[in-house]
From Swiss-Prot:
UniProt keyword terms in alphabetical order: Allosteric enzyme, ATP-binding, Cytoplasm, Kinase, Nucleotide-binding, Pyrimidine biosynthesis, Transferase
Species of the source: Rhizobium etli (strain ATCC 51251 / DSM 11541 / JCM 21823 / NBRC 15573 / CFN 42)
Reactions catalysed according to its record: UMP + ATP = UDP + ADP
Alphabetized NCBIfam families for the sequence: pyrH_bact
Cysteines engaged in disulfide bonds, as pairs: none
Listed name of the protein: Uridylate kinase
Biological or metabolic pathway of the protein: Pyrimidine metabolism; CTP biosynthesis via de novo pathway; UDP from UMP (UMPK route): step 1/1
Activity regulation, free text: Allosterically activated by GTP. Inhibited by UTP.
Lineage, uppermost ranks: Bacteria, Pseudomonadati, Pseudomonadota, Alphaproteobacteria, Hyphomicrobiales
Similarity-based family: Belongs to the UMP kinase family.
Broadest EC class assigned to this enzyme: transferase
Residue positions binding UMP: 55, 75, 136-143
Positions with a binding annotation for ATP: 13-16, 56, 60, 163-164, 169, 172
Gene assigned in the entry: pyrH
E.C. number(s) listed in UniProt: 2.7.4.22
Length: 240
């Protein structure tokens, strides 16, 4: 395995649930610090990193709709949850002396900068980790879609999707011990098989922009850096 990173600019997608650890709600600071240390390791390798965090540990917009409420309002609440998570992760990174900026799709200048592609590219060029908050800024779009969109806008060479397991399996390995992990799939195979990697819009957007999706376990300390150098357990979704 090469010690040099395979990718120089990447987008890391982390779910809100990843930040809550074993808790049933909110943010486990120890977990946030550990994820931050993995990102810091990538930065020390010279990799430019953008991050999209979900908000499911705080609120899910679909929960409002399922109870008969307004989906748009619910999604706005979920977007605010992603901003809380982004600020928490930024705090963990700054404790490690990693220069970090939060760019929000929802304008709130007293708290963080507003997103623009120009600001993104500037901060990346200055060596900062850029955390994208607020999803796409629009209801009905998941943070997976936000990850694919921001990856395309920042010119990322790959999307790293940190999940609960170390890749894409034929079935849920926690429920079906005989499930097997795919080493490699195409974007179209993911769509045709209905594999729950990212939502359909996100996978399609990644495919249209020729961005590979690398699925790995976000719970393995040092796993992000290992995969950046070509090692580790993972599934690569790519048409190349």
């Amino acid at each position: 395995m090469s010690l040099e990173p395979v990718y120089k600019r990447v987008l890391l997608k982390a779910s809100g649930e990843a930040l809550m650890g074993a808790q049933g709600f909110g943010i486990d600071v120890t977990v946030a610090d550990r994820i931050a240390s993995d990102i810091a390791e990538a930065r020390h390798m010279g990799v430019e990193v953008g991050v999209v965090v979900g908000g499911g540990n705080i609120f899910r917009g679909v929960a409002v709709a399922s109870k008969g409420g307004d989906r748009v309002t619910g999604d706005h609440m979920g977007m605010l949850g992603t901003i809380i998570n982004a600020l928490a992760l930024a705090t963990s990174l700054r404790k490690l002396n990693i220069d970090t900026v939060v760019l929000s799709a929802i304008s709130m200048p007293e708290i963080c900068e507003s997103f623009s592609q120009r600001a993104t590219l500037y901060h990346l060029s200055m060596g900062r980790v850029v955390i994208f908050a607020g999803g796409t800024g629009n209801p009905f779009f998941t943070t997976d879609s936000a990850a694919a969109l921001r990856a395309a806008e920042m010119g990322a060479q790959a999307i790293f999707k940190g999940t609960q397991v170390d890749g894409i399996y034929t079935a849920d390995p926690k429920k079906y011990p005989d499930a097997t992990r795919f080493d490699r799939l195409t974007h179209q195979e993911v769509l045709d098989r209905g594999l729950a990697v990212m939502d359909v819009a996100a996978v399609a957007l990644a495919r249209e922009n020729s961005i590979p999706i690398i699925v790995f376990s976000i719970h393995e300390k040092g796993g992000f850096a290992e995969i950046l150098t070509g090692g580790g357990l993972k599934t690569i979704v790519s048409d190349n």
